[in-house]
Curated annotation (Swiss-Prot):
Gene giving rise to this polypeptide: pex5
Domain of life: Eukaryota
Organism: Dictyostelium discoideum (Social amoeba)
Record protein name field: Peroxisomal targeting signal 1 receptor
UniProt keyword Cytoplasm present: yes
Segments for region (Amphipathic helix 1 (AH1)): 12-34
General function of this protein: Receptor that mediates peroxisomal import of proteins containing a C-terminal PTS1-type tripeptide peroxisomal targeting signal (SKL-type). Binds to cargo proteins containing a PTS1 peroxisomal targeting signal in the cytosol, and translocates them into the peroxisome matrix by passing through the PEX13-PEX14 docking complex along with cargo proteins. PEX5 receptor is then retrotranslocated into the cytosol, leading to release of bound cargo in the peroxisome matrix, and reset for a subsequent peroxisome import cycle. In addition to promoting peroxisomal translocation of proteins containing a PTS1 peroxisomal targeting signal, mediates peroxisomal import of proteins containing a C-terminal PTS2-type peroxisomal targeting signal via its interaction with PEX7. Interaction with PEX7 only takes place when PEX7 is associated with cargo proteins containing a PTS2 peroxisomal targeting signal. PEX7 along with PTS2-containing cargo proteins are then translocated through the PEX13-PEX14 docking complex together with PEX5.
Region of interest called Amphipathic helix 2 (AH2), as start-end residue ranges on this chain: 74-92
UniProt motif WxxxF/Y motif: location: 331-335
Post-translational modifications reported in the UniProt record: Monoubiquitinated at Cys-12 by PEX2 during PEX5 passage through the retrotranslocation channel. Cys-12 monoubiquitination acts as a recognition signal for the PEX1-PEX6 complex and is required for PEX5 extraction and export from peroxisomes. When PEX5 recycling is compromised, polyubiquitinated by PEX10 during its passage through the retrotranslocation channel, leading to its degradation.
Length: 641
């Protein structure tokens, strides 16, 4: 079933490890959603586009128009692995999420096209794309599809393109040339100025649109000649395309996503060091301010020093490089000390939803509400508990888990870090933190946390030290090399228990393989974990989401049913189940499932999913009813209670 079977037994698979479990079921999510969530959003269209804050529009325009491209767009590639499922509650969407979502959307589009698999994007139709943005995306998508498709059918290419456009709220049938002609004035907003498009700009834009087919034909002919000569690699083809074409940062999203992963991470480090170091230099901690580490961060931020490859290079106008080299050990020590201070700094950022603790809201009440699926109420109760008892590590952990299930991973991360600060031995909290880091696009931190989990687990401490000892501490690993190292580390941990798999190790491996899109291997790992944790509802949901992300929605149904069997109030599994039904064109079942989820937790994104199903059913009357946000209004037609 999976190439992972070729590895030694006991890694992520063993005899009878739930191998064909889905055949027993006849019923039944960030980046690409949270890996716990179903990759469902190819169905979203422009009906649900939401207007963002004015500043976000300006920021997005600056990305497309070339301003600020040195600021943070490349940092986002390191910070945002798009594994989300469903439209975010983007009311407070950080500006930095916009370009990262586009980056990974383009990368997933290319990767899935190359693999000959249908695209499963997250919905980004809430982004405030301008008319020109949409036109460029549509044309560029068509070209890149032709470039990377490996002889797939026309139907596949059409479906693939439609899924890409739907995810951004771009109507497939839009005639941009005609619409443009009908608009006498076209205004482009940037971060610094607002200008009206001139006739010359229009002519240039019109020429760009009209010339694309011919340009692409010439490009493809030239490309074939180079291929025949055997002189051109994939990345060189993109460079040929880029010649003579002044790409905006949008276009760089295409080219960045098609370079080698290692080069992309190196470019990220090179171009965004100022953004990485600036917030560190602003930490108001007297001990850190006097440290050599903070001095080094200030030098990187000011340009006194820079990172080239794996070396630190200093400006010759400043102190000699040899002097700084002698301080390397001290910097390392200061950096470790910095990590000890970071948790307290982050916990100060936690945003409480209550002002005062309520006596009736205890840990027990919060846990009860959580188990019943009342996430918002459970969060309030758990906040009361940690306000009364700020050293209650268990309360902080469950508050973090509740936030994670409520799709609030930044808040979850803060709570879980606080829990681990109080009790570093809590392996459940550390593994949950790794998941939230992944969901919040913090890949490096997810890898750090997974390695910390292994290091702090007595059974694997010796293995961890042995592995770390084999790596040159002065060597530089880009993120994907680091990912490979961490994966191999957990593979060895899994091999140490061939006949009795550790479900936590297998879960970590499933997470790592989801990061690298190795869904078959991830499926094997989750199945092996379930053999020893058959009642873990979150694990069943992870399995279902991974199956769905690998275009196996029919199999995913069974996994979601098992998750709900063990926790009927698990809203995320209900939502994912509704999406799987939708993927299979089972609209009645999908609507019923979404209504059941809303009855437990009326999240706006689930209402949006429901309205989309009603539109696919051609039931505008139900769409209007859904706008009232009254779930009881559907009891006469749907049995969901």
């Amino acid at each position: 079933m999976s190439v992972f079977r070729d590895l030694v037994e006991g890694e992520c698979s063993e005899p009878n490890a739930l191998g064909n479990f889905v055949q027993h079921f006849t019923n039944e999510r960030s980046y690409h959603d949270k890996f716990e969530d179903h990759g469902k959003n190819e169905f979203y269209d422009s009906l649900y586009r939401h207007e963002e804050e004015y500043n976000e529009q300006r920021h997005l325009d600056s990305i497309f128009d070339g301003e600020g491209q040195e600021d943070d767009i490349h940092l986002m590639m390191d910070r945002h692995l798009n594994l989300r499922d469903g439209p975010r509650e983007h009311k407070e969407l950080p500006l930095s999420n916009v370009e990262s979502d586009l980056q990974f959307l383009f990368q997933d589009f290319i990767n899935s096209t190359r693999a000959g698999q249908l695209f499963h994007p997250s919905s980004l139709n809430h982004l405030p794309l301008t008319f020109e943005d949409k036109s460029k995306i549509k044309n560029r998508s068509s070209i890149m599809l032709k470039h990377f498709s490996n002889g797939e059918s026309e139907q596949f290419e059409e479906d693939q393109l439609n899924r890409m456009l739907d995810s951004l709220g771009i109507e497939v049938g839009d005639d941009f040339d005609q619409v443009w002609d009908s608009q006498p004035h076209h205004t482009t907003t940037t971060t610094t100025t607002t200008t009206t498009t001139t006739t010359g700009q229009y002519d240039q834009y019109q020429k760009y649109v009209n010339d694309l087919p011919e340009e692409y034909e010439d490009y493809e002919q030239h490309q074939q000649e180079l291929f025949d000569d055997g002189d051109l690699e994939d990345y060189e083809l993109d460079e040929e395309w880029d010649k003579g074409d002044d790409f905006h940062p949008y276009d760089s999203a295409w080219t960045e996503s098609d370079r080698s992963v290692e080069a992309a991470w190196d470019e990220t480090a090179r171009r965004t060091i100022s953004d990485i170091t600036r917030p560190i230099t602003q930490i108001n901690d007297p001990k850190l301010k006097k440290s050599n580490f903070m001095k080094f961060m200030n030098q990187l931020n000011s340009g006194e020093a820079s990172i080239v490859g794996s070396d630190v290079v200093h400006n010759p106008d400043f102190k000699r490089q040899e002097e700084y080299q002698q301080q390397a050990d001290q910097w390392t020590e200061d950096y470790n000390d910095f990590h000890e201070h970071i948790p307290q700094h982050r916990i100060q950022e936690y945003q409480f939803s209550i002002q005062e603790a309520r006596d009736s809201d205890t840990l027990e009440r919060g846990m009860g509400l959580f188990n019943e699926g009342h996430l918002s109420d459970s969060i309030i109760a758990l906040e009361s508990e940690v306000k009364r008892n700020p050293e209650n590590a268990m309360a902080w952990m469950y508050l973090g888990i509740a936030h994670a299930e409520n799709d609030q991973d930044s808040q979850a991360t803060t709570c879980l870090i606080k829990s681990l600060q109080i009790d570093p031995t809590n392996s459940k909290a550390r593994l949950a933190l790794a998941v939230s880091h992944t969901n919040d696009y913090q890949k490096e931190r997810a890898l750090d946390t997974l390695e910390e989990w292994l290091q702090r687990t007595p059974e694997y401490t010796a293995l961890y030290k042995q592995f770390k000892g084999s790596v040159d501490p002065n060597s530089f690993l880009d993120t994907w090399s680091r990912h490979e190292f961490t994966t191999n580390l957990f593979i060895e941990a899994a091999r140490s228990r061939p006949s009795n798999p550790d479900p936590e190790v297998q879960t970590a491996l499933g997470l790592l393989y989801n990061m690298s899109y190795d869904y078959d291997k991830a499926v094997d790992c989750f199945k092996a974990a379930l053999q020893n944790s058959p009642t873990d509802y979150q694990l069943w949901n992870k399995l279902g989401a991974t199956l769905a992300n690998s275009n196996r929605s029919q199999e995913a149904l069974g996994a979601y049913f098992k998750a709900l069997e063990h926790k009927p109030s698990y809203v995320r599994a209900r939502s994912n189940l509704g999406i799987s039904y939708l993927s299979l064109n089972m609209f009645q079942e999908s609507a019923t499932t979404f209504l059941g989820a809303i009855a437990i937790h009326p999240a706006p994104n689930i209402w949006d999913n429901l309205k989309m199903v009603f539109r696919l059913m051609n039931r505008e009357d139900l769409v209007q009813k859904a706008d009232l946000r009254d779930v009881n209004a559907f009891l006469d037609e749907f049995q969901f209670m």
